[in-house]
Amino acid sequence: SYVFGFEESYGYLTGSYVRDKDGVDGAYMICEMFSYYATKGISLLDKLDELYKTYGYCLNTLHSYEFDGSAGFAKMQSIMQAFRGNIKAFGGKKVVKLLDYAYGLDGLPKSEVLKFLLEDNCSIVVRPSGTEPKLKIYISVSAENREAAEKVECEIVKDAEKWFA
């Protein structure tokens, strides 16, 4: 049964009773959490800190790079091909597996998306935007704390941007 889903632009779906991702459902869930933890004398920030201490810190970022015109489109295609090369690591994190969705994968339709699974539960996803002349890079980093996650994320971004040359 479906429990929870979300997407990059902050749309949320909880349960099977909501049919569209929007901020209303997310706001409702935040109010529910606030009410529940208020009865226990716990703030939402305190609860979030407790979760970080228990499970570690997870940082998710999106970086967009604009490429205008037909030359920009060709450049994006070239960059995607470069990413399909034999990349061993990003930001010092070894590539454990590359998932290339160009031919369909795991029953999903074909899509110009590359997902690099990295060691230490980190990942980087690279794809062209479907609506804008942009290349998007999604980075997910798990670390002990925020500072460590931000440091790893910064190194991954630096390595990824090298492939734009």
Language-model features: locations:
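Phosphate-binding and adjacent anionic-ligand microenvironments
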Residues: 1-127, 134-138, 145-151, 157-165
